[in-house]
UniProtKB/Swiss-Prot annotation:
Lineage: superkingdom: Eukaryota
Further comment: An IgG (called leucokinin) binds reversibly to the cell membrane of neutrophils in the blood. Leucokininase on the membrane releases the active peptide tuftsin from the gamma chain. Tuftsin is essential for maximum stimulation of the phagocytic activity of neutrophils.
Name the record gives this protein: Phagocytosis-stimulating peptide
Length: 4
């Protein structure tokens, strides 16, 4: 997933 994408970094926050």
């Amino acid at each position: 997933t994408k970094p926050r």
